[in-house]
């Protein structure tokens, strides 16, 4: 029997911390659906399409990973994919408090869904996509945190965003 799990997230951009969770999760699960979310509560730097492309490129060598984008409740996507296990990475206590709320609400909608929490490896415990973008915005090196092919895309996108914002006048 194949054991499948879904790892949803915004992945804006996908980091080595995310990849570490995927690789470690494969010790438990045969197949992992990497579900790239269009999150209405966030304002991602990259479009859903771009983030899906990055995720596919970053996981191309991992034959057990299937990447797709979605714009729906995670629980609905899980039902469509017939997946009952949700993977979530935890870096710290605040992640846990947030993720426990999501796990409980997912169980409310479907008592067949189980959430598996994976503790971040120490080296990635302080890493977030938001932090990567902030470091890049101020000219810091981000090549230790994200795949090399994404580094230039982040820098380019931030430059373009900065140029657009300079055209805005404040009173």
From Swiss-Prot:
Q: Which UniProt keywords apply?
A: ATP-binding, Coenzyme A biosynthesis, Cytoplasm, Magnesium, Nucleotide-binding, Nucleotidyltransferase, Transferase
Output one GO BP term: coenzyme A biosynthetic process
Q: Which reaction does it catalyse?
A: (R)-4'-phosphopantetheine + ATP + H(+) = 3'-dephospho-CoA + diphosphate
Q: Can you tell me where the transmembrane regions are?
A: none
Subunit structure, interactors included: Homohexamer.
HAMAP family from the entry?
Answer: PPAT_bact
What protein name does the entry list? Phosphopantetheine adenylyltransferase
């Amino acid at each position: 029997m194949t054991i499948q799990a879904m790892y949803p997230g915004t992945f804006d951009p996908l980091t080595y911390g995310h990849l570490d969770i995927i690789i470690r999760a494969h010790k438990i699960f045969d197949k992992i659906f990497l579900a790239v979310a269009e999150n209405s509560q966030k304002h991602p730097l990259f479009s859903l399409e771009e983030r899906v492309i990055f995720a596919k490129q970053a996981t191309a060598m991992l034959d057990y990973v299937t990447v797709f984008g979605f714009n729906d409740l995670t629980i609905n996507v899980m039902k469509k994919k017939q997946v009952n296990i949700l993977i979530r990475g935890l870096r710290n206590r605040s992640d846990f408090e947030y993720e426990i709320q999501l796990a409980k609400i997912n169980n409310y909608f479907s008592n067949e869904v189980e959430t598996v929490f994976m503790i971040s490896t120490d080296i990635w415990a302080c890493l977030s996509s938001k932090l990567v973008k902030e470091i890049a915005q101020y000219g810091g090196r981000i090549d230790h945190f994200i795949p090399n092919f994404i580094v230039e895309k982040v820098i380019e996108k931030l430059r373009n965003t900065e140029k657009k914002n300079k055209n805005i006048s404040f009173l």
